[in-house]
From Swiss-Prot:
It catalyses: tRNA(Pro) + L-proline + ATP = L-prolyl-tRNA(Pro) + AMP + diphosphate. It comes from Chlorobium chlorochromatii (strain CaD3). Consists of three domains: the N-terminal catalytic domain, the anticodon-binding domain and the C-terminal extension. Homodimer. It comes from the Bacteria. Catalyzes the attachment of proline to tRNA(Pro) in a two-step reaction: proline is first activated by ATP to form Pro-AMP and then transferred to the acceptor end of tRNA(Pro). This is Proline--tRNA ligase. One of its GO terms (cellular component) is cytoplasm.
Length: 481
């Protein structure tokens, strides 16, 4: 029940943990750093998977599965890549009762094991592009964990593609980060900033990393998806060449891109409240709960409730009736608010007599009456669409209110405690590191989209807030998960 949840104003971190556990989304596992994703949480992941998988296939990608274990010799082939992941790797040294001749790494990401296969599959330009996605689990040995946001084992998808030219690879990188942006905004109702990572924040082994960044209700940033231009690094490491139209041999060009179950954490922290989970209808497994008020003619009320649920289901709206009598309607209201059901429909004998019923929105808690007539399904669908759009609009307004521009370091240190800060940076790793050391804020994104850049004057030259040196552009700083 919602009374188990610490308020956001009292302790935001504890609120998040309380909500995840009270709504039965996930729980701590007996294995340190791992979590159990409970059915309510996994149902959200399945909705995310279904939408993303469809979007991947619409852009020409197919699914495959590669081994969990990666030979040490493969990992060592890409020096920058392994250097970036070495501290997080889990290593298998024994199997079958004896020490292994070669250590096996439990995948932290799959570039190396996948490129060992791509070398065998790619011979000619006719084999390109190769567009493969994998749904899998990965292991990164995290020291400080938080349910969904950072765990030792987590679920994700990772796309790995091979191309004949760098231009094609760059197009793929941008195509897929835009797929993620569309998913975040149209399904998660989560506004995101699309752009590039700084060199110190990019993926290990990448030429460039593009990302989408979202703001949580505490003003912190959360990286919601990444897409990497890997250049020819992995092709060279695995000697993956193809014969061109001109009969010459060239190394292929590579990309990788991925999102994970941390999106569930983002969904929770962006929209939920002190009563519990708030889900956008497009990611809610159950969109409408019908609660009969069982007074008077129970049979008639239940008959009407079942008919409404059937009509909604036929129209593609996920609806169900809670006709149990062991709990009061008030208890049910609170329970389904905790679970984040987007819309509640209350139906009693008086409602049936008057030809009207009460519907309550989860996002705003607003109650309205709608007619029990042949427009009911259309009315419910319109309300669900309104909820989806209103949740996005509310999150966008919040981000705008918590985004400030500063021109000096003193103002920066105050502003970065509350949200996103747009400021000039001199482009050096040294300045970036100093700011991170002193404030714990990092450069989240170098925005690329025209609308955002125009709104905040991102591409206007100026002076770095920290060093006082010339700056070619502004960037977005924030503390982050």
């Amino acid at each position: 029940m919602a009374d188990k949840i610490t308020s956001r104003s009292e302790d935001y971190s504890q609120w998040y943990i309380d909500l995840v556990r009270s709504a039965k989304l996930a729980d701590y596992a007996d294995v340190k750093g791992c979590m159990v994703i409970r059915p309510n949480g996994y149902a959200i992941w399945e909705k995310m998977q279904a939408a993303l998988d469809r979007m991947f296939k619409e852009t020409g990608h197919v699914n495959a599965y590669f081994p969990l274990f990666i030979p040490e010799s493969f990992i060592a082939k890409e020096a920058e890549h392994i250097e970036g992941f070495a501290p997080e790797c889990a290593v298998v040294t024994h199997g079958g009762g004896q020490e292994l001749a070669e250590k096996l790494y439990v995948r932290p990401t799959s570039e190396t094991i996948i490129w060992s296969s791509y070398k065998k599959w790619i011979q000619s330009y006719r084999d390109l592009p190769l567009l493969i996605n994998q749904w899998a689990n990965v292991v990164r040995w995290e020291m400080r964990t938080r349910l969904f946001l950072r765990t030792t084992e987590f679920l994700w998808q990772e796309g790995h593609t091979a191309h004949a030219t760098h231009e094609e690879a760059q197009e793929e990188v941008l195509r897929m980060i835009n797929v993620y942006k569309t998913f975040a905004e149209e399904y998660m109702a989560l506004p995101v900033i699309l752009g590039k990572k700084s060199d110190s924040e990019k993926f290990a082994g990448a030429l460039e990393t593009f990302c989408i960044e979202a703001m949580m209700q505490d003003g912190k940033a959360l990286q919601a998806g990444t897409s990497h231009d890997l250049g020819q690094n992995f092709a060279k490491a695995f000697d993956c060449k193809f014969q061109t139209h001109e009969k010459t041999l060239e190394y292929v060009w590579a990309t990788s891109w991925g999102v994970s179950t941390r999106l569930i954490g983002a969904l929770i922290m962006a929209h939920s409240d002190d009563r519990g989970l708030v889900l956008p209808p497009r990611l809610a497994t159950r969109q409408v709960v019908i609660i009969p008020i069982l007074k008077g003619d129970k049979e008639s009320v239940l008959h009407h409730a079942d008919n409404i649920a059937a009509a909604l289901t036929k129209a593609g709206i996920s609806a169900f009736v809670d006709s149990s009598e062991q709990n009061s309607p008030g208890w049910k209201f609170a329970e389904y608010e905790l679970q984040g059901i987007p819309l509640r429909l209350e139906l009693g004998p008086r409602d049936i007599k008057n030809g009207m019923c009460v519907v309550a929105r989860r996002d705003t808690l607003e109650k309205t009456e709608i007619a029990l007539d042949d427009r009911l399904v259309m009315s419910i669908n319109e309300i669900l669409n309104d909820i989806q759009q209103d949740m996005f609009d509310a999150a966008l307004r919040f981000r705008q209110e918590r985004t400030v521009q500063v021109n000096n370091y003193d103002d920066f240190k105050v502003a970065v405690e509350k949200g996103f800060v747009i400021a000039h940076w001199d482009g050096t790793v040294e300045t970036e590191a100093k700011i991170k050391e002193e404030t714990k804020a990092t450069i989240r994104v170098l925005p690329q989209e025209d609308d955002y850049c125009d709104t905040y004057g991102i591409n206007e030259p100026g002076t770095c807030i920290y060093s006082g040196k010339p700056s070619a552009r502004k960037v977005v700083f924030a503390k982050a998960y």
